[in-house]
Amino acid sequence: MYAVIATGGKQYRVEKDEVLRLEKLPGQVGDTVSFDQILLFSDGESVSVGTPVLGNVTVSGKIVEQDRAKKILVFKTKRRKRYRRKQGHRQSFTAVRIETIQAG
């Protein structure tokens, strides 16, 4: 059994007990989150595709971590002009363990 959800501008294929690293969601570690944009659902026998979303399927999970990813460096330069700019960035993310996928 799996579903395709949309959150944070991206789409994820999720299964029960899977841990996902999503774009930052509000909430503390241990809070329950539910996803309302379910694009596709499969129970192993049949596949339901939303137009664009399914209304009778719910996916919920529990926040297991709120953290920031590793730092990436952005370095800009212009040749022969001594122009150099170095900038770092760390993206915030939320790790969510999928607990239930229910159709009904």
From Swiss-Prot:
It holds the Pfam family Ribosomal_L21p. GO terms for biological process: translation. PROSITE patterns: RIBOSOMAL_L21. One of its GO terms (cellular component) is ribosome. Belongs to the bacterial ribosomal protein bL21 family. HAMAP family: Ribosomal_bL21. NCBIfam families: L21 (TIGR00061). This protein binds to 23S rRNA in the presence of protein L20. Part of the 50S ribosomal subunit. Contacts protein L20. This is Large ribosomal subunit protein bL21. It comes from Desulfosudis oleivorans (strain DSM 6200 / JCM 39069 / Hxd3) (Desulfococcus oleovorans). The lineage of its organism: Bacteria, Pseudomonadati, Thermodesulfobacteriota, Desulfobacteria, Desulfobacterales. The gene is rplU.
